[in-house]
Amino acid sequence: MKPISLPSRLCHSIQSWERVTRSQLDFMVHRFEKDPAYQFIDTKYDLIQQTNVTKTDPVRGRNTIYGWIQGRGLEALAGHAQWLASGNHPDDTKSVSRIKTDIRLLINRLDQRIAEQKCNLTFMMHEDGSKPALFGVERVAENCHFTDLFYSKGLAAAAALLEDSEQFERAKVLFDRVCDDILTDQFVSDQASLDPKNPVKPVPGRHGHGPRMIALGGLSLMLQITGDTRYCEIGFEMIEHIFKHYVHHSNRHDAISSLAQQLQVGDMWEFIDDKSEPWLEAGRVLRCDPGHAIEFTGLAMKFLHHCEQRNLLNSSQTTSAQQWRHTLCHMLQHHVQLGFSADGIGIYKAIDLIQRTPLHSDMPWWPLPETIRAAAFARRYCPAEEVDCYDAIMLK
């Protein structure tokens, strides 16, 4: 594995990012602690207006709790606590202690909701556990959902930080079940459609790459904690599946060849059908989410990095990892260029790969941190001139 060599200008930038991270982390911890009766991760804040969102807002208000955000919040708090514990900042020890206390409270709060609902967490719920009017897909008891995926990896990270073997085993059982459902096509998306331009509700015969992509983050985490080679094998199977069915390459010989004139090497589409062929909307639109493609490159490279850190790769996997990294680095650059708006405002949410044009004007915030993560991993393996480009992203 290549050693990290950072130019001085980037080291200075990283120090700035660390200050920003500490400030934002303190902000979120303070919001969690200021209302002991609430005890959920509180993201109900308008960064533009610098005001709290009205509680009665049916989508963004404090009375609408998102299971995804609570699970992801657990994972983020635990990960940042580990980062703080590895540093030498004078306030870090106190901050880690605060975060551990808050994590315990959050786990207890979520366990209370699980017990009251007599099922796992759901995509949306009110503070009292009742279902909002905008509630998404009804839980199917025998199927795992995205909320299970986010919560299981969040609980695993939190339990590892707290050295709580009982909670970790509980998280592991749920995460393993999620992976089994993904690999056997039993996984069901529970996301509610809050925007008609974002078609997230399940459609019979349509299959997205999202479950495998998000699972890669959990597999990286479980590898770090357990060193179990089984998670390495599952991750390789998931990456191979995505490359085979969702990414265009020059030697494809399946039904996608009929679209070859419109497609470019590295294009990644969102959905396939029951025959593993690209899902065309209205018979003519092949949807790409550049942010999701960028997210996949970052999560895949992070997974491969942790496999190497643990020395878990056999010779065949090492060869595949080297080949995949070349493709992933190309895909990162390709989708930043494909999705980036001409006026430099952001990355489009949806691109039609046939017409090579945006499907609408939405540009969400989250592709930016996904690009930063992917660039951080890609810079280890790319030519010098490309590393300069990645450094430029970090310096921005």
Where are these regions (language model features)?
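Glycan-recognition and catalytic cores of secretory/periplasmic carbohydrate-active enzymes
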Residues: K2-K396
